[in-house]
């Protein structure tokens, strides 16, 4: 199975600042068709996970453009610019390069008060 690793379990950010959340995969997620099958989700407290980014860098419908995704075949970054209070929750990367699909352990974003 492909192992997804998020080394930072948490991030503490001041509103208005930017933050980057990283993720690594044990195998390249770049497919021969040119797509990189890395996805980012946000699970807000008490809610179901919400898709933010699909195929590494594509913004999901309805997601603010403060969110962006980038990376290579095995190293990926989710960047949030101008962090807002509504951005709190746990951010997960997930690979859909091959079955079984696997998730990182998550990075919890918290806001400095």
Curated annotation (Swiss-Prot):
<dbReference type="InterPro" id="IPR013106">
    <property type="entry name" value="Ig_V-set"/>
</dbReference>
<feature type="region of interest" description="Complementarity-determining-3">
    <location>
        <begin position="94"/>
        <end position="102"/>
    </location>
</feature>
<keyword id="KW-0374">Hybridoma</keyword>
<keyword id="KW-0391">Immunity</keyword>
<feature type="disulfide bond">
    <location>
        <begin position="23"/>
        <end position="93"/>
    </location>
</feature>
<dbReference type="Pfam" id="PF07686">
    <property type="entry name" value="V-set"/>
</dbReference>
<dbReference type="GO" id="GO:0006955">
    <property type="term" value="P:immune response"/>
</dbReference>
<feature type="region of interest" description="Complementarity-determining-2">
    <location>
        <begin position="55"/>
        <end position="61"/>
    </location>
</feature>
<dbReference type="InterPro" id="IPR036179">
    <property type="entry name" value="Ig-like_dom_sf"/>
</dbReference>
<feature type="region of interest" description="Framework-3">
    <location>
        <begin position="62"/>
        <end position="93"/>
    </location>
</feature>
<dbReference type="InterPro" id="IPR013783">
    <property type="entry name" value="Ig-like_fold"/>
</dbReference>
<feature type="region of interest" description="Framework-2">
    <location>
        <begin position="40"/>
        <end position="54"/>
    </location>
</feature>
<keyword id="KW-1064">Adaptive immunity</keyword>
<keyword id="KW-0502">Monoclonal antibody</keyword>
<keyword id="KW-1280">Immunoglobulin</keyword>
<dbReference type="InterPro" id="IPR007110">
    <property type="entry name" value="Ig-like_dom"/>
</dbReference>
<dbReference type="GO" id="GO:0002250">
    <property type="term" value="P:adaptive immune response"/>
</dbReference>
<dbReference type="GO" id="GO:0003823">
    <property type="term" value="F:antigen binding"/>
</dbReference>
<feature type="region of interest" description="Framework-4">
    <location>
        <begin position="103"/>
        <end position="112"/>
    </location>
</feature>
<dbReference type="InterPro" id="IPR003599">
    <property type="entry name" value="Ig_sub"/>
</dbReference>
<keyword id="KW-1015">Disulfide bond</keyword>
<protein>
    <recommendedName>
        <fullName>Ig kappa chain V-II region 7S34.1</fullName>
    </recommendedName>
</protein>
<feature type="region of interest" description="Framework-1">
    <location>
        <begin position="1"/>
        <end position="23"/>
    </location>
</feature>
<dbReference type="GO" id="GO:0019814">
    <property type="term" value="C:immunoglobulin complex"/>
</dbReference>
<feature type="region of interest" description="Complementarity-determining-1">
    <location>
        <begin position="24"/>
        <end position="39"/>
    </location>
</feature>
<dbReference type="InterPro" id="IPR050150">
    <property type="entry name" value="IgV_Light_Chain"/>
</dbReference>
């Amino acid at each position: 199975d492909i192992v997804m690793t998020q080394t930072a379990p948490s991030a503490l950010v001041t509103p208005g600042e930017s933050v980057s959340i990283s993720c690594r995969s044990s195998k390249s997620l770049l497919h021969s068709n040119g797509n990189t099958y890395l996805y980012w989700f946000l699970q807000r407290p008490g809610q179901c996970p919400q898709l933010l980014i699909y195929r590494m860098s594509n913004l999901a419908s309805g997601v603010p453009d403060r969110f962006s995704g980038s990376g290579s075949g095995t190293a990926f970054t989710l960047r949030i610019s101008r962090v807002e209070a509504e951005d709190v929750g746990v951010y997960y990367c997930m690979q859909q390069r091959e079955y079984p699909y696997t998730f990182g352990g998550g990075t919890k974003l918290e806001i400095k008060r």
